[in-house]
Amino acid sequence: MYAADLKRAVEYDLEQERMFDYGGLSTDEIIRHVSRFTANLWQIHAFCEGNTRTTAVFVIQYLRSMGFSVNNEIFARHSWYFRNAMVRYVYKNNEGVMPEPKYLERFFRNMLLGEQWDLRNRYLVINPPAEFAEQPRLDTPTSPMQTEQAPNKHRTSTEQAPNMFYTDDK
């Protein structure tokens, strides 16, 4: 995408958002819309690096301007989940994989409503093994709760900064 195309895409999304009326919407509808807006803005991918971080900062500022009390804590703790949830929101292919908004909506439900969805990437996998097929909500007794960390039978992350934060103060 060229700079002019990127500018037009960003301007289009921002103009659509400017024209959107949040009045009278339920909390679920607001979260649904904010999720869509966030994923669409992220999908433009205006930068070589830092698109997810930039989107997170923008969303924090935007939600604050709407009166929400938010900070970057959830983004810092679950940045990879946030990025992958946006991928799942917009991704489709010829093999029947369709966009799935629920993961990004659950991220925002945790942030805005204090819900406790388990925000681990294993639940975003397409065609996951049975034990990861249903993302648990940790604050409801009817949700499939996991009382302990699932075994590392299925790798869910790569070690990008191995032991860099370990200090041995002997």
Tell where the protein language model's regions lie, with residue ranges.
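FIC/Doc superfamily catalytic core
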Residues: 1-170
